[in-house]
Amino acid sequence: MYIQTQFASLLLLAGTSLASQVRKYNFTITSQWSSGDGHGRPVFMINGQSPGPLIEADEGDEIEVFVDNQLAAETTMHWHGIYQIDRPWNDGVPGVTQYSMQPRDTYTYRFTVQQQYGSYFYHGHFGPAFADGMRGPMWIAPAAWRPRPYELISDSSHDVEQMKKAEKHPFHVVISDWNAEPMDILLVMYRDTGIVPWCSNSIVLNGKGRTYCHSAELIESVGGPGRNTLGCLMQPDQELYSNEQVCEATQTDLEIFQAEEGHEWIWINFIHSGAHHELQISVDEHEIVVVAADGEFTYPQRVHAANCNLGERISILVHLNQKPGDYAIRVTSLRQEQVIQGLGILRYPGSSHGAQEAEPPATKPWVHLNGTLISDKLQQMDEMKLAPFPSRPPPPQSDHTLKFFVNMTGTGSWALNIGPHQAFRQQLPPLLWEEDSRGVTTYESDVQGGSMQNGSVVDIIFTNGANVNSQHPFHKHNNKAWVIGTGTGGFPWDTVDEAIQQGGMADSFNFVDPPIRDGCRLGNTTGDWTVIRYDIAFPAASMLHCHMIHHFGAGQQVVLLEGVESMAKIPAEMKDRVHSNFRPPLRYGPLD
């Protein structure tokens, strides 16, 4: 078993710096009409805004969020990337860790932010609520004792101090693709017809954006033929089942990142809470320095563009070393299904523009409209080289191995191994304490039948199945994991050790400095594989799922029971909450 000696030593080093306070927030969730990108539609709001309010805390603080559900439907709130160390019932997953909040119901989430820092976010976890606006940013300020990688960026003490100043005043931007219709409507259409909801109206930054209508010639030159006026690839029989999608340009406000006087660097946290599109981040005429991923410091990468997948966070520093003025921040889709780009504005201190002026500046981009770099001399972020700073190698061996074969098992049905995680399970008594709610998508043991005990190390091997040509951005609740290997051609071995000893695959794995994330990417091609390794540091019922909305909604989810032999007693008030007495339907499948 692997003991978290590194975390323990860091906590001892912190000493009295972990004196904490309680950060209290009140959230009221409503559905309101909104037109952030110029097209009106119902949106889930938190305190009248989407994204919701920023939650800020220091390491060691307790966060308390009172949530008032004023919707006509059930809901929960998940704290994406946050370790639910002491109170696993506050992870916000209906049917797994809690009963959902009924309409006009309330619930208070309480958790302590321990052993982590940086950029996170919260979002609804009942159905596709996060894709319809129920989301917001979180920032856990890194403790003063934590090492920073700034001296690897510049040997100037002045620059290093400016980077520290930027870190203390970060910008937070929730980025996402944005559809013309509510996502539950689009998912029902997907279930019945197989038409994927990939055609977005806009890419929004903090809920702001525009629909840009490009010429057919430009769209075809960067994306190829067979596209509509929104740049979307048309799907077979799409015109029979979905509303016609015609590009209608809008002129709404853009998000402005106004640098303060005296600041020579700025820090921006990009938080991807979208539904379908992987996004490419770039700032016109500026190199960007990637300094953190999924909250934690990394060895810096100085690049011209950085990709950010669904559920991920990428934190960058930008040196304000160009002529003062406005520069476009571009967030561009990397998915082949649609040619689409969103814009924000980086504004230098003392810019002559008025505070409300938000026209896209005519600055030089680093990327084409399809997200590719305009020159092979430019640098793209390499996500597999985002090594943690300071170095934190993974455990050398694992105690358990789980293997998941990703496959499409029918129209509108995705599975990890045996079958989809049915949507009705979010209305069952939570499986955290109710064993009868645990189905074939609940995993209590590894491939050898051993239970995953507290303190043990787990490998998860993902393999892309037959007839699958779509990538999968997975998210692991409650743990960060080292992404120790990726490859092609399938993974026929039962364990990583077998792959190395019997398959000669040693060069396919990194046990020295792999990235550590709360998710991973499984490649697009049949036979692609990814292996992650993590340690079970506290008991939990942890969901593992694809964050692409139609995969998530169509059942590509499992629940892992980790360290449950050490589980704290579930409070009686969790079990006694008002809830629906639900009997599963006869139909077996997602979105029931």
UniProtKB/Swiss-Prot annotation:
Cu cation 4 binds at H475. Pathway: Pigment biosynthesis; melanin biosynthesis. Gene3D superfamilies: Cupredoxins - blue copper proteins (2.60.40.420). Cu cation 1 binds at H78. Cu cation 2 binds at H80, H123. Residues 32-142, 173-350, 445-563 form the Plastocyanin-like domain. Residues 1-19 form the signal peptide. Its EC number is 1.10.3.-. Belongs to the multicopper oxidase family. Laccase involved the biosynthesis of dihydroxynaphthalene (DHN)-melanin, a bluish-green pigment forming a dark layer in the conidial wall that protects the conidia from UV radiations. The first step of the pathway is the production of the pentaketide 1,3,6,8-tetrahydroxynaphthalene (1,3,6,8-THN or T4HN) by the polyketide synthase PfmaE though condensation of acetyl-CoA with malonyl-CoA. T4HN is not stable and easily oxidizes into the stable form flaviolin. T4HN is also substrate of the hydroxynaphthalene reductase PfmaG to yield scytalone. This is Laccase PFICI_06862. The lineage of its organism: Eukaryota, Fungi, Dikarya, Ascomycota, Pezizomycotina.
